From Swiss-Prot:
The chain crosses the membrane at residues 3-23, 42-62, 82-102, 127-147, 180-200, 214-234. It is a multi-pass membrane protein. Residues 264-289 are annotated as: Disordered. This is Melatonin receptor type 1B. It comes from Gallus gallus.
Length: 289
C-alpha cells in the first residue's frame, strides 16, 4: 500500500519542480517568455501530475477497500510484484490519457492564470472525456470503496464484545481516515474546475462567455493548490509523518546534531525509527475485542 502513497507523492512533487516555477516566472514577466516547447512540455507535465494524482488516489482507495473488507485475499492480490505492476499501470494509463493533448492542440498559454495548461474549449469531446476519466469515474469508484469501508466500520462498532468477532485495529482506521481526507480535499479542490469544463464542453459558444473570469481563476488555483495539501494532511493526521517532518527540519536547522544522532543510532543497533508508513502489512488485519 505504501507504494501508491509514494507514487501519489511523486505526482504532487513533479509539478513543484517544473511547471510551478515557470508559472512564477510568467507572473514576474507578466507573460510567457520561454517559447512554445516549454509551454507544451510544462502543460503536459501538469496533466501527468493531475491525472496521476487522481489515479493514485483511486488505487489507494481500492487498496484500502481490499485491505479492510477483503483481508484474506489482500496479501495475494497485493503482493510486492503485483503492487509494482499496479503502480506501473497507473502511470502508463496516465500517459495514455495525457498524450492526446498534443493532437487536439489543447495545451496553450492562458494569461488569466499565467500558465500553459489544458484549454477546455479546444475540443469538446476531449474535454468531456477528460472530465469523465479524470473526475467522474474515479470519484465514483473511490466513493464506493470508502462507503463500503464506512459501513464495515459502523458494523464493527455496533458489535457486542466477543472473542471470536474481529474488529479493526485503531491504526488501520487512522490510515483509512488519512487517505479519506486526501480524497475529500482532492474532490473539493477539483470539482469547480471540472464542472466548469463540462459545462463549457457541452455548449462552448453559450457557456464559455458566461463563466466569470474570477470564478475561473479561483477554480484553477484551487486545483493547483491541491498538490501542496497532501503533505500537510499526512503531517496532521499521521504521527510517523510528523516525526519524520521534525527530523527533516532538525537536519536543516542543526545538521551537525542531526548527523551525530544518526551515527549514534546506527551504532546502538537496530533501533531506528519506523518509516512513515501509512499501513503495516506485517501486522494482523483483524483483532479481537
Amino acid at each position: 500500500g505504501n507504494a501508491f502513497v509514494v507514487s501519489l507523492a511523486l505526482a504532487d512533487l513533479v509539478v513543484a519542480l517544473y511547471p510551478y516555477p515557470l508559472v512564477l516566472l510568467a507572473i514576474f514577466h507578466n507573460g510567457w517568455t520561454l517559447g512554445e516547447m516549454h509551454c507544451k512540455v510544462s502543460g503536459f507535465v501538469m496533466g501527468l501530475s493531475v491525472i496521476g494524482s487522481i489515479f493514485n488516489i483511486t488505487a489507494i482507495a481500492i487498496n484500502r477497500y481490499c485491505y479492510i473488507c477483503h483481508s484474506f485475499a489482500y496479501d495475494k492480490v497485493y503482493s510486492c510484484w503485483n503492487t509494482m505492476l499496479y503502480v506501473s499501470l497507473i502511470w502508463v494509463l496516465t500517459v495514455i490519457a495525457t498524450v492526446p493533448n498534443f493532437f487536439v492542440g489543447s495545451l496553450k498559454y492562458d494569461p488569466r492564470i499565467y500558465s500553459c495548461t489544458f484549454v477546455q474549449t479546444a475540443s469538446s469531446y476531449y474535454t468531456i472525456a477528460v472530465v469523465v476519466i479524470h473526475f467522474i469515474v474515479p470519484i465514483t469508484v473511490v466513493s464506493f470503496c470508502y462507503l463500503r469501508i464506512w459501513v464495515l466500520v459502523l458494523q464493527v462498532r455496533r458489535r457486542v464484545k466477543s472473542e471470536t468477532k474481529p474488529r479493526l485495529k485503531p491504526s488501520d482506521f487512522r490510515n483509512f481516515l488519512t487517505m479519506f481526507v486526501v480524497f475529500v480535499i482532492f474532490a473539493f479542490c477539483w470539482a469547480p474546475l471540472n464542472f466548469i469544463g463540462l459545462a463549457v464542453a457541452i455548449n462552448p459558444s453559450e457557456m464559455a462567455p458566461k463563466v466569470p473570469e474570477w470564478l475561473f481563476i479561483i477554480s484553477y488555483f484551487m486545483a493547483y493548490f491541491n498538490s501542496c495539501l497532501n503533505a500537510i494532511i499526512y503531517g496532521l493526521l499521521n504521527q510517523n509523518f510528523r516525526n519524520e517532518y521534525k527530523r527533516i527540519l532538525m537536519s536543516l536547522w542543526m545538521p551537525r546534531l542531526f548527523f551525530q544522532d544518526t551515527s549514534k543510532g546506527g551504532t546502538d543497533g537496530q533501533k531506528s525509527k519506523p518509516s512513515p508508513a501509512l499501513n503495516n502489512n506485517d501486522q494482523m488485519k483483524t483483532d479481537t475485542l
